Amino acid sequence: MTSLREFRKLCCDIYHASGYKEKSKLIRDFITDRDDTDTYLIIKLLLPGLDDRMYNMNDKQIIKLYSIIFKQSQEDMLQDLGYGYIGDTIRTFFKENTEIRPRDKSILTLEEVDSFLTTLSSVTKESHQIKLLTDIASVCTCNDLKCVVMLIDKDLKIKAGPRYVLNAISPHAYDVFRKSNNLKEIIENAAKQNLDSISISVMTPINPMLAESCDSVNKAFKKFPSGMFAEVKYDGERVQVHKKNNEFAFFSRNMKPVLSHKVDYLKEYIPKAFKKATSIVLDSEIVLVDEHNVPLPFGSLGIHKKKEYKNSNMCLFVFDCLYFDGFDMTDIPLYERRSFLKDVMVEIPNRIVFSELTNISNESQLTDVLDDALTRKLEGLVLKDINGVYEPGKRRWLKIKRDYLNEGSMADSADLVVLGAYYGKGGKGGIMAVFLMGCYDDESGKWKTVTKCSGHDDNTLRVLQDQLTMVKINKDPKKIPEWLVVNKIYIPDFVVDDPKQSQIWEISGAEFTSSKSHTANGISIRFPRFTRIREDKTWKESTHLNDLVNLTKSLNSYI
C-alpha cells in the first residue's frame, strides 16, 4: 500500500526531472511490481485534472474555509495567495496556526486520501466541508496538507501532463486513453499487454478531435493536398452524443456533462433520426436556430438568453459518427464515415440535421465557400482531410475564420491603453500577469474598460514589470482613481499612474461582443489577444470610445 509520503516524494521528483523521458521513467520505476489497484490509484491521483469528482470549492473558498478552521485572517491568506499557489498558502498558515497541531510524521496512505476526496465530493454544505477539512488536517503534516489541498485544486504542479504519466504504463497508453477515457481498463490491459483490444466505450466521453488555426487558403491546400471537406463552423456548443439502448449521455468539448436544458429534447428526436441504432456515438454541434434554420449568435443557448429568441429552437448539427452498434469507426477514412452517416441518419428539420459540408478541389472553390459563410454571418469553416481518420484529442483539422486571415491580423482590432494589472497565479504568482485594457471617453473625460488581456511569455512579462508605472491598490474600491470607470468585478490589483503616459497595445480577438461588466458602452472583445505594442501612437491616437462604437457598427454591417 502506497503512503502519502511516498507519493509526495514521487511528485517532487517528477517536478525536478528535466524532461519527458526522465519524468516517465520515474513513474514507471515507481509503479513497477505494484498491483493493478495500487497502480490505478497512483496514476489517478497523479492526474487530478482528469478526475470526475467535484469538490464545489475554488481557491478563494478553500482559503475561506481554512481561515475559519485555523482562525487566521482571511484577508492575510488571500494576500499570500496572490504571491503563489494555494497549496503553499495553506501549508504556511497551517504551520503558524494554534488550533490544530500539524503531525510530525506522515501517517496517511494514498487509499485514505482517496477515500477522503470521495467523501468531500459528496458534500455541499459549508459546515460539512469544514468538518471534513478539519478532520484531514488533524492527521496531516504541513506537507501532507499541502498535497491534499493541491489534489482538491486538481493541480499538483508537477509539470507532467497525461502523456507523461500514461506513457509510463505503456508507450501507447496515452493515445488509447484519449479514445477510451477509461483509466482502469488501460492499466488492467497494459498488464496483459493487450492495449490494442481497447475501443470506444459508449456512455464514456472520448477526447474530441480538434482544429488548429489557418490564416490562408494556400496553407490549407499544403496541409491537405489529396483533398478536403470544408464544413461550416457553427457558433454553438460542441456536443458528443452517446446512446445505448434507451439511455443517453451528452458531453461537452471538455468531456463534462452538458446542461440538461440544452439537450433533453434530443432524447425524443435521436431515436427518430437513427431508427436502426441500438448504440451510437456522434460528434456534433448544438446551435439555437430561428424558424428558417438560420443559426443564432454564440451564447444564445443559455436559458435567459434563449427567451430573447421566441421563435427559435435548438438544433443538433451532426458532423461525424464515431461508433455504431458495436463498430468503432474512428479508424476508417472521413469520407467513408460521412457516407455511412448519410445512410443511417434521417434528418428532422430544425431538430437534427447534417452539418453543411462541401468537397473542395481548388483554392477558388474554397475562397467562394468561405466568403459565402462569412456573408451569412457564420463563424468560418473547419477543413478536414477527406481521407483522415478520427484522432481523439489531436489537432489535425484546420479552422479558417475571419480573424485568422491576413497572416493572423484581424480586421476588428483595437489600439487600447493599459489601465491596470492583476497578479498572476501559479508560476506567475507575485507579478503582474493579466492586464486591464480600456479606452478614453471624450464625452465624460474618463477612461472606460474594454477587456482583460493575458498570454505574454515569461520574458515579456519580466520586461513589463519595469516598463509599466503602476500603483498598487489591492482591488480596493476606495482606491480607484477618479479617471477610471470600472465595475467591481474588474477592479485590478494595480492601476497605472497616468493613463496618458501608459502603453498602447493592439488587441485583436474573435469579434467584438457585448458585456455588461465592462464600462465602454458594454463593448468588449471575445478571446482577446495581444498583437503588438503601438509605440508609434500616443493616447490621443489610440482607439477612443467613439472610435470603438463606430468600429463595431461598421463590422456588424459587414458580418
UniProtKB/Swiss-Prot annotation:
Gene3D superfamilies: 3.30.1490.70, DNA ligase, ATP-dependent, N-terminal domain, DNA ligase/mRNA capping enzyme, Nucleic acid-binding proteins. ATP binds at E231, R238, E285, K384, K399. Its main location: host cell. It is an enzyme of class 6 (ligase). CDD domains: OBF_DNA_ligase_III. Signal peptide: none annotated. It comes from the Viruses. Induction: Expressed in the early phase of the viral replicative cycle. Mg(2+) 2 binds at E379. GO terms for biological process: cell division; DNA biosynthetic process; DNA recombination; double-strand break repair; lagging strand elongation. GO terms for molecular function: ATP binding; DNA binding; DNA ligase (ATP) activity; metal ion binding. One of its GO terms (cellular component) is host cell cytoplasm. Keywords: ATP-binding, Cell cycle, Cell division, DNA damage, DNA recombination, DNA repair, DNA replication, Early protein, Host cytoplasm, Ligase, Magnesium, Metal-binding, Nucleotide-binding. Mg(2+) 1 binds at E285. Its cofactor is Mg(2+). Its EC number is 6.5.1.1. The active site is at K233 (n6-amp-lysine intermediate). It is found in: Host cytoplasm. It holds the Pfam family DNA_ligase_A_N. It catalyses: ATP + (deoxyribonucleotide)n-3'-hydroxyl + 5'-phospho-(deoxyribonucleotide)m = (deoxyribonucleotide)n+m + AMP + diphosphate. The keyword Nucleotide-binding applies. DNA ligase that seals nicks in double-stranded DNA during DNA replication, DNA recombination and DNA repair. Recruits cellular topoisomerase II to sites of viral replication and assembly. Interacts with host TOP2A and TOP2B. Belongs to the ATP-dependent DNA ligase family. This is DNA ligase. It comes from Monkeypox virus.
